[in-house]
Swiss-Prot record:
It comes from Capsicum annuum (Capsicum pepper). NCBIfam families: carotene-cycl. The lineage of its organism: Eukaryota, Viridiplantae, Streptophyta, Embryophyta, Tracheophyta. Catalyzes the conversion of the ubiquitous 5,6-epoxycarotenoids, antheraxanthin and violaxanthin, into capsanthin and capsorubin, respectively. Its main location: plastid. Pfam families: Lycopene_cycl. Signal peptide: none annotated. This is Capsanthin/capsorubin synthase, chromoplastic. It comes from the Eukaryota. Monomer. Belongs to the lycopene cyclase family.
Length: 498
């Protein structure tokens, strides 16, 4: 839902592997108003007059690097030592670097391209970024969101939604890191080594950098984090485009969170049958009458829904909506692992971001949560490394892992995983019934659920309300399809309470 979205070969020829995070052709997100005329001129020869021919259009935006005078690790030194080494300079990694370094902790961020623009598109609820003091990093807001449950029912959500400006957010975090004297090293990390009170990384250029704590913020595909349980994740799969179109049917003051309608598959019986069993929805951000971000999304599937299947459904949907794509500015492919077990707690490498288990198991949202939890993890790190006793080794690992995942937060996550397991059991009609009831509850509860703010008690209240106010068919779905996930949830909650 939030598109968590690195250059990728032709998506028509490639099928993603399960550990892929998300991949895009481009990283530049042009301003939807200021560059309108120049885009029309520049992309004129690449445009098309055919319905849905966006599959044949090469994205036109070019990768962009930021002009920031960051401080690099001195390569003349034989040995580089830091308190904290962060692998990756995505949103979670930079946010943690910013938060830890402001307490005087020596931080080094290692990434193959620290100044490159993030390829991801991020959508957040405006109130989430307001609470974090990051509202100035939003470049477009919609006062209302809508959910098309079916052709005959639409929900209007009075909760403003925003698109994150990747450039503004990364510049803000980088500039804070510069002020706090964070060092950067341009390389890919190949190995992580551990001694009793010190760890080190080995980079692809042979460089070794040592530190008291290594934090993996490199994303879902990382091999540095260990698990002690089978990784039975669900997968969110999506194909998205930022496109110039002749026109589109969306209201400019409304962000379309979900469109579960399937009338576009009326002449596609094969696709319709599959969509009935494993549904996908359209997510749309309209910026003006000729610029829109469109994304066909499988909310969660296991095994992973075919990426080609998602693209075929998007072709049929845009054709039905009468959307003619003139040019594709950006194209993104998203594969997010959701739910499943947490990493082994504790372990020698700390994690933040996609590999840490903080992605919302029922929705795929993560960026706002990463921004909120990085200060929490930073506090646990500073309490150990910033103390006069300088706690290191196994005690440090125990403190930081339990700082990010205390027992109450683990129990809450189990409830969200139950939500994911429920979604996996539902077909299109069951999914419609669930969201019809979900968005009718007190906004406090659905706001809190989607923003990972509810306690176990509040989640129990939400569940009882949903069951009590759902249709009889929805109740039947819960009773007949969700018994096993419910028993598993209760067992896991009991274990976490020990």
């Amino acid at each position: 839902m939030e598109t968590l979205l690195k250059p990728f070969p032709s998506p028509l020829l490639s099928i993603p592997t399960p550990n892929m995070y998300s991949f895009k052709h481009n990283s530049t997100f042009p301003n939807p108003t200021k560059q309108k005329d120049s885009r029309k001129f520049h992309y004129r020869n690449k445009s098309s007059t055919h319905f849905c021919s966006f599959l044949d259009l090469a994205p036109t935006s070019k990768p962009e690097s930021l002009d920031v005078n960051i401080s690099w690790v001195d390569t003349d030194l034989d040995r580089a030592e830091f308190d904290v080494i962060i692998i990756g300079t995505g949103p979670a990694g930079l946010r943690l670097a910013e938060q830890v370094s402001k307490y005087g902790i020596k931080v080094c961020c290692v990434d193959p391209s620290p100044l490159s623009m993030w390829p991801n598109n991020y959508g957040v609820w405006v109130d989430e970024f307001e609470k974090l003091g990051l509202e100035d990093c939003l470049d477009h807001k919609w006062p209302v969101s809508c959910v098309h449950i079916s052709d005959h029912k639409t929900k209007y959500l009075d909760r403003p939604y925003g698109r994150v400006s990747r450039k503004k957010l990364k510049l803000k975090l980088l500039n804070s890191c510069v002020e706090n004297r964070v060092k950067f090293y341009k390389a890919k990390v190949l190995k992580v080594k551990h001694e009793e009170f010190e760890s080190s990384i080995v980079c692809d250029d042979g460089r070794k950098i040592s530190g008291s704590l290594i934090v993996d913020a490199s994303g879902y595909a990382s091999d540095f984090i260990e698990y002690d349980k089978p990784r039975n994740h669900g997968y969110q799969v999506a194909h998205g485009i930022l496109a110039e179109v002749d026109n589109h049917p969306f209201d400019l003051d409304k962000m379309m969170l979900m469109d579960w309608r399937d009338s576009h598959l009326g002449n596609e019986p094969y696709l319709r049958v599959k969509n009935t069993k494993e549904p996908t929805f359209l997510y749309a951000m309209p910026f003006d009458r000729n610029l829109v971000f469109l994304e066909e999304t499988s909310l969660v599937s296991r095994p992973m829904l075919s990426y080609m299947e998602v693209k075929r459904r998007m072709v049929a949907r845009l054709r039905h909506l009468g959307i003619k794509v003139r040019s594709v500015l950006e194209e993104e492919k998203c594969v997010i692992t959701m739910g499943g077990p947490l990493p082994r707690i504790p372990q020698n490498v700390m994690a933040i971001g996609g590999t840490s288990g903080i992605v919302h198991p029922s929705s795929g949202y993560m960026v706002a949560r990463s921004m909120a939890l990085a200060p929490v993890l930073a506090e646990a790190i500073v309490e150990s490394l910033g103390s006069t006793r300088m706690i290191r080794g196994s005690q440090l690992y125990h403190r930081v892992w339990n700082g990010l995942w205390p027992s109450d937060r683990r129990r809450v996550r189990e409830c969200y995983c139950f939500g994911m397991e429920t979604l996996l059991k539902l077909d299109l009609e069951g999914t419609r019934r669930l969201f019809d009831a979900f968005f009718d509850v007190d906004p406090k509860y659905w706001h809190g659920f989607l923003s990972s703010r509810l306690s176990v008690k509040e989640l129990a209240v939400l569940s009882l309300y949903l069951f009590g106010h759902a249709s009889n068919l929805a109740r039947l779905d819960i009773v007949t399809k969700c018994t096993v996930p419910l028993v598993k949830l209760l067992g896991n909650l009991a274990i976490e309470s020990l």
